Amino acid sequence: MTAATKLQSEDLRCAVVAEGLSLHNVSRREFCAAGGTLLAGDKVVSGRFSGDRLISVRTEKLGDVDLEADNYILATGKYFSGGLAADMDRLYEPLFGLDVEYDEDRSKWFDASFSAPQKFLEFGVKVQDGRALKDGVKIVNLYPAGEILAGISSAQCDARESVINSAMEAAAAIGRK
């Protein structure tokens, strides 16, 4: 059972924002059978916040239609899937403008030796109690999971396990609400 199907089977309204590869590893039939709605080929492009809550998201294909849920799981991955982006002087989360943990000295982002650990792979969204931070404020219904999290790197031996565990932890936290 995946984190998304666990939430659906418990009748918890949750939107999963997944641009990374995680959705390709989920049984779509199982997810939909549990009550989930999959917008295949669509992409979340913005979110509307009110105070410490994410109220709704909008997608590329649905345009100005607001999709609302009680909780949201952000599983957008890191750089290759667009979950994180960088310019010459900063690293940022482009979808919601979430706080990101990274070294501000760009020269320390990588090691010249290709086989050495690369620090930039450890960068990611900051969390407090499993929830995302935006401008230092904990967003109480937004749970980052997977590689978008600071400290999780695809180069780690246990990366797959860390990604799965973070998603299950997000689902468990939502279930406890």
Residue ranges, per PLM feature:
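Residues forming the flavin
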Residues: 1-177
